[in-house]
Amino acid sequence: FVTILSNPAAAEDLTIYTYDSFNNEWGPGPIVFKRFEKQCGCKLKVVSLGDSGTVLNRVILEKANPQADILLGLNNSELEKSFSYDLWEPYLSPLLAKVPTDLRVDKKNRVTPFDYGFVAFVYDSQKLGKAPKSLHDLLDPKYKRKIIIENPKTSSPGLSMLHWTIAVYGEEGYLDYWKKLQPNLLSVTDGWSAAYG
């Protein structure tokens, strides 16, 4: 999601906070931002701050004195938290009509969806002949100490993984799932780079 901060930073440049992988050399950021500058006739200052949870925490800490104009890259897991801090200015994009209605999650237009993705596991197809098809498959003892996950306290993908298990197993069953998965975990990392880097 893209959001406009309340009381944005007053500067000649437009400051955008985003997550690292969006603005990485292999991410879409460099191309998107260059085209945006050309289209709007403005100069962007893009600040990459880790994953989207880290970016949101920075904006919360700066609420009294915002240093950015736009936050690009919140995911669904962080929206409710962000709304509780009253950080965003409503903005009705003229392009919102092109966005499928099931992706328009905020009737107050505090956020504008710009992409979506799926939660999935990355695996080495040369080492693993047949990929697991479900969360339940990951409980198989053949995966003992072979699974790396991201911490939901420090990682947006980790939080999405936690929410995925709650959606599948319910409030009553997700903790049992995690207990059963524990022997198969090699590591719980702070974020994307440590898990996949």
Positions of predicted regions on the chain:
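Sec/Tat signal peptide C-region and signal peptidase I cleavage site
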Residues: 7-11
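Extracytoplasmic ligand-binding site segments that recognize negatively charged/polar headgroups
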Residues: 12-13, 19-29, 50-54, 66-197
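Bacterial N-terminal signal peptides
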Residues: 1-6
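Short, well-structured alpha-helical segments in soluble
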Residues: 57-64
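Class I S-adenosyl-L-methionine
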Residues: 33-37, 60, 83
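Short, polar/charged alpha-helical segment
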Residues: 17-45
